[in-house]
Amino acid sequence: MLNFLNICSKTRKSWVLLIFTVVILELIALYLQHIVLIKPCVLCVYQRCALCGIGIAGLIGTIAPFTPLRFFSIPIWIYSAWKGLLLAKEYTDIQLHPSPFFMCDLFVQFPHWLPLNKWWPSMFDADGDCAEYKWYFLSLEISQWMLIIFANYLIIAILVSLSQIIDLKKWNNK
C-alpha cells in the first residue's frame, strides 16, 4: 500500500484529486451558507482556512509531483489536516457537551497582514453561533462530519509521508 501511495504521490492526478476534494467541500460550505442560509461560526471559518491549507498543499504538489517539491507540500498537508482536526474536535465538543457559560468568539481573528474576512467576507466572515445545531446528514452534525473528513485527510497525509521515507530508504540502498 505504501508503494502504491508513493507512486500516486508522483502523479499530477492524485494532487489534483486532493485539490478537487477541497474545492467540493468548500463549495458545500458555501452552498450551506448562501443557499440553505446556515450562518457559519468562527470555528467553521477556521476549518475553511484549514481546508484552504490542504488545497495549497495540493497545488504545490500539482506543480511538480515528480520532483522533490512535493516534499514541501506534504508537511503543509499534515499541518493543515491536524489543525482542522483539532478545530473540528473543539467544535464537536462544544456541540456534544454544551455549557451555559461557553461563548465562542464573536469575530474571526486573522493576522493583520492576511485579513481574509475583509478580502473575501462571503467566505471568511463569521456570524453564527458555535453551540447551535445547524444541519444533519445521516444523523451526524456538520462538526462531526468535519472531524471524520479531517481525520481521513490526516491519515492519508501521514501514509503518503511514510511512503516517501520508505522510497528514500530504497534509493539509499541502491
From Swiss-Prot:
It is found in: Cell inner membrane. It comes from the Bacteria. Residues 1-14, 66-71, 164-174 are cytoplasmic. The chain crosses the membrane at residues 15-31, 50-65, 72-89, 145-163. Disulfide bonds join C41-C44, C104-C130. GO terms for cellular component: plasma membrane. Belongs to the DsbB family. This is Disulfide bond formation protein B. It comes from Blochmanniella pennsylvanica (strain BPEN). The gene is dsbB.
